[in-house]
Amino acid sequence: MATIEEIAHQIIDQQMGEIVTEQQTGQKIQIVTALDHSTQGKQFILANHEGSTPGKVFLTTPDAAGVNQLFFTSPDLSAPHLQLLTEKSPDQGPNKVFDLCVVCGDKASGRHYGAITCEGCKGFFKRSIRKNLVYSCRGSKDCVINKHHRNRCQYCRLQRCIAFGMKQDSVQCERKPIEVSREKSSNCAASTEKIYIRKDLRSPLAATPTFVTDSETARSAGLLDSGMFVNIHPSGIKTEPAMLMAPDKAESCQGDLSTLASVVTSLANLGKAKDLSHCGGDMPVVQSLRNGDTSFGAFHHDIQTNGDVSRAFDTLAKALTPGESSACQSPEEGMEGSPHLIAGEPSFVEKEGPLLSESHVAFRLTMPSPMPEYLNVHYIGESASRLLFLSMHWALSIPSFQALGQENSISLVKAYWNELFTLGLAQCWQVMNVATILATFVNCLHSSLQQDKMSPERRKSLMEHIFKLQEFCNSMVKLCIDGHEYAYLKAIVLFSPDHPGLENMELIERFQEKAYVEFQDYITRTYPDDTYRLSRLLLRLPALRLMNATITEELFFKGLIGNVRIDSVIPHILKMEPADYNSQIIGHSL
């Protein structure tokens, strides 16, 4: 870092200087001096002055007749700072004050979203966060960002904004018109201040949690030693965005950060309207949602005929639908030769041919972007909701699943959504950064222990569930399971006939047997030397039944949708037309 004296010499000799600050490592800011042209050719001397400090430099002419100027910087300032003093200014006070933008070095207009920035960087950051824009860098993600080149790489500019303290949570949602209802918008449906144990995850978290009992301490120590739980800190988080989104898909995968919350909010608003028009009737729809009751009767019929359900999922479509259509098959291709039965038909048709095709192998998850500096409940809940929706879309893309009829399809997904979701966590382990999410849960439980906000029994059940999740995902990752194997494992789980209340259980059992036969054939052809691979994979499925669906909801979804049960949302998703899903299963390839 150049000294003040060196900077002064550069300013005098060249009328142009360069300042390199600690806050802007590798970033150069050009300062054009305010010297009067009439003073050119005169000799300036670095003069000592009473009260001068190492941070001050006085410039004067030999005859002391020139314009005295003082350039100084202060190490306690959060941004580069430049002041000019002249003899003409009253009481030798500062007549010009410059605060430099920490992002690009332009003249700052104040503190915006937690950092001193110019109006340009302020507006750029606000637009990027409000619209959830995703950028990609054409270089090596270390582009120079300054006043003249700040618009060349939006990715590096946004990363620089976040790195220098601009807070995404400080950006408010766009305000609605006055005539619109004052209820929170979908983007505000899940506040970052409301998390499942009421702790703000934006603050740095402790590296190693401690626990009450010795047994819990031993288990947690082994968990951390395995390397699956990582410390939560800014540098660890910031190195990951490149793997969350492929650069060529980045621009086409933009969407709101509250898909599940938007669906629940839309359904709740529809329910309120229905309740107002039928006052004094049965249980309100909103209460039915919270209780998990899905027998809405006429309500379902009305909102489906009016197309309101489809509009309720507009946000989901934006989040999952890209501009490219080549990455997935067209609805006509996917449904060719497959039966489509209306709910309530007495007959069931078994589809000929294989249960799963190559189109069912792809399982592409689009993560919310940009990734926050510290994980919060909104980001975790949104990531989990996208995985849940994608799992349901995958099930609906199977013709044999549609052949079961609407009621059986709903019953199967309601019974086994937790198992499908857990398999999805293992499959998307790296893309979702599940190890960091689980470590966040552990740290939050540790904090609740210190603050005595949770009963020991509840804390123990949550911790055991987290350990089961970690152990299951860890074992699946070690087996190096490919996309075909995950697809067959999900099909075997989905077509389980042992759930009470299912109709035509014989057909469901035949579908499961068909999935097993195709799975066995694939393993034999692909891994001929691994005799026990099929057995090892199938033996992982019983562990899925140990996962408590209620605890999964509390960990991953409660902060986003409150007390609304996943069971109550599933029927609305599955009653959409199958063709609507084929164009939405798209994103970052695993």
UniProtKB/Swiss-Prot annotation:
Its main location: nucleus. It holds the Pfam family Hormone_recep. Sumoylation requires both PIAS1 and UBE2I. Sumoylation appears to dissociate NR2C1 from the PML nuclear bodies. Enhances the interaction with NRIP1 but inhibits interaction with KAT2B. In proliferating cells, stimulation by all-trans retinoic acid, activation of MAPK1-mediated phosphorylation and recruitment to PML bodies with subsequent sumoylation, suppresses OCT4 expression. Phosphorylated on several serine and threonine residues. Phosphorylation on Thr-210, stimulated by all-trans retinoic acid (atRA) mediates PML location and sumoylation in proliferating cells which then modulates its association with effector molecules, KAT2B and NRIP1. Phosphorylation on Ser-568 by PKC is important for protein stability and function as activator of RARB. It is found in: Nucleus; Nucleus, PML body. Keywords: Activator, DNA-binding, Isopeptide bond, Metal-binding, Nucleus, Phosphoprotein, Receptor, Repressor, Transcription, Transcription regulation, Ubl conjugation, Zinc, Zinc-finger. Signal peptide: none annotated. GO terms for cellular component: nucleoplasm; nucleus; PML body. Isoform 1 is highly expressed in the adlumenal compartment of the seminiferous tubule of adult testes (at protein level) and in the eyes of newborn animals. Weakly expressed in other adult organs including the seminal vesicle, prostate, ovary, adrenal gland, heart, thymus, placenta and brain. Expressed during embryonic stages in developing eyes, brain and cartilage primordia (at protein level). Also expressed in the developing spinal motor neurons and in the sympathetic-, parasympathetic- and sensory ganglia of the embryonic PNS. Changing K575R: No effect on sumoylation. Changing S461A: No effect on sumoylation. Disruption phenotype: No visible phenotype. Mice exhibit normal spermatogenesis and testis development, as well as normal central nervous system development. NR2C1 and NR2C2 double null mutants result in early embryonic lethality and increased apoptosis. Embryos die around 7.5 dpc. InterPro entries: NHR-like_dom_sf (IPR035500), NR2C1/2-like_DBD (IPR048245), NR2C1/2-like_LBD (IPR048246), Nucl_hrmn_rcpt_lig-bd (IPR000536), Nuclear_hormone_rcpt_NR2 (IPR050274), Nuclear_hrmn_rcpt (IPR001723), Znf_hrmn_rcpt (IPR001628), Znf_NHR/GATA (IPR013088). Changing E240A: Abolishes sumoylation. Residues 1-166 are annotated as: Required for interaction with KAT2B. Induction: By ciliary neurotrophic factor (CNTF). Repressed by vitamin A. Induced by retinoic acid. Changing S461A: Little effect on PKC-stimulated protein stability nor on activation of RARB reporter. It comes from the Eukaryota. Residues 98-173 bind DNA. The keyword Calcium does not apply. Residues 333-577 form the NR LBD domain. PANTHER family: NUCLEAR HORMONE RECEPTOR. Orphan nuclear receptor. Binds the IR7 element in the promoter of its own gene in an autoregulatory negative feedback mechanism. Primarily repressor of a broad range of genes including ESR1 and RARB. Together with NR2C2, forms the core of the DRED (direct repeat erythroid-definitive) complex that represses embryonic and fetal globin transcription. Binds to hormone response elements (HREs) consisting of two 5'-AGGTCA-3' half site direct repeat consensus sequences. Also activator of OCT4 gene expression. This is Nuclear receptor subfamily 2 group C member 1. The lineage of its organism: Eukaryota, Metazoa, Chordata, Craniata, Vertebrata.
